């Protein structure tokens, strides 16, 4: 039956092949949050393999014409994957629909069409290494691993919903990322998901199926072994008690000047709320991204009010817009920042967002695009300015946190920082732009994996959720649901040493890619000697 199905898929051509690739990519989205149906990958990727088999059937064409059919299949697969996985981005444009609704097709269709080029590239690279049986599965894993790595930095990068996350729906399956990194997880996921295509036979088919089963069992086994050695999920003797404030301010209200005092009072009220029975008195309180509705440098009364709300020894970490006056009366600069404020209402330290969202927080090619009448989605004169360096944020008792503002948490290779060693990751964000869509769940999963990957606990304060404290094994020690109003009180989990120490992320990536490339090329050469 599988051979018959594969044969029918291989024989598809024209729009039928494109539609099958699109639907296969869309089905693969079910492997990502909030669905986490990872078995969908065992359908989508074998179909992709068979579609590429059909696309490369001709061998009499020139080099480019041999590559293009596979690239087209990859593009349609990617287009389906990204349209169905990122459609919710368009909801941000409907917050101010009168001004931004015109851009909805660009967000819902244009961005997926661009991102699909990476999967077209993946299929094209795989085609170069394609060989019968196991060789094509290795080639596809290499192509996707390379493409997903490029997605982390090309054109400022947008590594959202990397295939590797499909293999990490629960903490048990997150532990391998500490060893092989996110690119390695993407390669593992593609190889294992695509392996059922070998059930139709081919060179080394049994070897490939056996290897996929072994890798899947090793992935699960390593997770079980790691978690069996993990400490208690909640450390009730932790050195630092943390409170996360989740106000769930509607996005339409957030930038309304008439609502500023009400928003501020709500944040202060949640900060002053007594801990529930059995919960610790917080040492550190965290507010979400741009939570403070004032420019603190020019609003001393807001700082005084914060100081009054904090108990002795408490520290507030809060997201706010930071203003830097222009030289000689020039235009001021604005930064998306995190402030540390002590119990006397003094600013102790600040950290600015380094990796801004294109078109959301700043305009690429600003002079040209402003000339066309375009502007950022965030209503900030001139947009935000990027911070120059990422540094550890001084907090309390000699401890410091690694600040990641909003979508900075999705970049696995951007966690280098200056200053003393951080004892936690602090991620402040505002996902209210996206409402009750898959977006906030996908964003949270990526931040959750950073804790495992880096060996640092995660403190995540999101305006409308998902707010949580996550230990270094990916386990949640306290959380609030989407759109809930309240606080999370919990002790800060301890950090742990990463599996490989802290080498630059690119070293791990290059080793994975070279291993896959060597295996693919070696299998091609061996097959030619043995079967021809």
Swiss-Prot record:
GO annotation terms (biological process): lipoprotein biosynthetic process
| Domain spans labelled CN hydrolase | 245-494
Q: Name one GO molecular function term.
A: N-acyltransferase activity
* TM stretches of this protein: 37-57, 75-95, 106-126, 128-148, 179-199, 207-227, 505-525
Q: Where is the active site?
A: 289, 353, 406
Pathway listed: Protein modification; lipoprotein biosynthesis (N-acyl transfer)
Give a GO cellular-component term: plasma membrane
Per its database record, what is this protein's job? Catalyzes the phospholipid dependent N-acylation of the N-terminal cysteine of apolipoprotein, the last step in lipoprotein maturation.
Which protein are we looking at?
A: Apolipoprotein N-acyltransferase
Q: Which organism is it from?
A: Brucella suis biovar 1 (strain 1330)
Lineage, opening ranks:
Bacteria, Pseudomonadati, Pseudomonadota, Alphaproteobacteria, Hyphomicrobiales
The primary gene name is lnt
């Amino acid at each position: 039956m599988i051979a018959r199905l594969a044969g029918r898929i291989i024989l598809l051509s024209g729009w039928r092949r494109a539609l099958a690739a699109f639907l296969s990519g869309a089905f693969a989205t079910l492997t990502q949050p909030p669905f986490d149906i990872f078995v969908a990958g065992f359908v989508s990727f074998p179909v992709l393999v068979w579609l590429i088999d059909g696309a490369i059937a001709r061998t009499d064409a020139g080099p480019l014409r041999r590559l293009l059919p596979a690239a087209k299949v990859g593009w349609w697969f990617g287009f389906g994957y990204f349209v169905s996985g990122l459609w919710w981005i368009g909801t941000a444009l409907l917050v101010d629909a009168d001004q931004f609704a015109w851009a909805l097709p660009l967000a819902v269709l244009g961005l997926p069409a661009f991102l699909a080029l990476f999967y077209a590239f993946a299929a094209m690279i795989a085609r170069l290494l394609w060989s019968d049986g196991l060789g094509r599965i290795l080639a596809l894993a290499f192509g996707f691993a390379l493409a997903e790595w490029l997605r982390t930095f090309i054109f400022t990068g947008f590594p959202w919903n990397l295939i590797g996350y499909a293999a990490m729906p629960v903490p048990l399956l997150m532990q391998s990322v500490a060893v092989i990194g996110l690119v390695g997880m993407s390669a593992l996921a593609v190889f294992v998901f695509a392996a059922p295509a070998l059930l139709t036979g081919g060179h080394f088919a049994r070897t490939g199926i056996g290897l996929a089963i072994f890798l899947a069992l090793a992935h699960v086994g390593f997770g079980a072994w790691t978690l069996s050695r993990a400490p208690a999920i909640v450390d009730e003797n932790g050195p630092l008690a943390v409170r996360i404030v989740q106000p769930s301010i509607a996005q339409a209200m957030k930038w309304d000047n008439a609502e500023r005092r009400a928003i501020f009072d709500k944040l202060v009220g949640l900060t002053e709320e007594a801990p529930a029975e059995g919960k610790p008195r917080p040492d550190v309180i965290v507010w979400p991204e741009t939570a403070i509705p004032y420019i603190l440098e020019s609003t001393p009364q807001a700082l005084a009010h914060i100081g009054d709300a904090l108990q002795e020894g408490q520290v507030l970490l809060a997201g706010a817009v930071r203003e830097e006056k222009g030289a000689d009366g020039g235009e001021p600069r604005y930064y998306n920042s995190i402030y540390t404020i002590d119990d006397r209402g003094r600013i102790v330290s600040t950290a600015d967002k380094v990796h801004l969202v294109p078109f959301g927080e700043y305009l690429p090619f600003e002079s040209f695009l402003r000339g066309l009448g375009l502007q950022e989605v965030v209503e900030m004169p001139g947009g935000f300015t990027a911070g120059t360096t990422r540094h550890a944020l001084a907090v309390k008792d000699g401890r410091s946190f690694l600040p990641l503002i909003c979508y900075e948490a999705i970049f696995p290779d951007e966690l280098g920082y200056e200053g003393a060693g951080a004892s936690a990751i602090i991620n402040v964000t505002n996902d209210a732009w996206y409402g009750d869509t898959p977006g906030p769940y996908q964003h949270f999963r990526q931040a959750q994996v950073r804790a495992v990957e880096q060996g640092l606990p995660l403190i995540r304060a999101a305006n409308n959720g998902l707010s949580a404290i996550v230990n270094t094994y990916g386990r949640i020690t306290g959380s609030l649901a989407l759109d809930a109003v309240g606080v999370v009180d919990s002790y800060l989990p301890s950090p742990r040493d990463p599996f490989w120490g802290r080498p630059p992320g690119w070293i791990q990536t290059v080793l994975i890619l070279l291993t896959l490339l060597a295996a693919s090329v070696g299998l091609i050469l061996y097959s030619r000697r043995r079967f021809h």
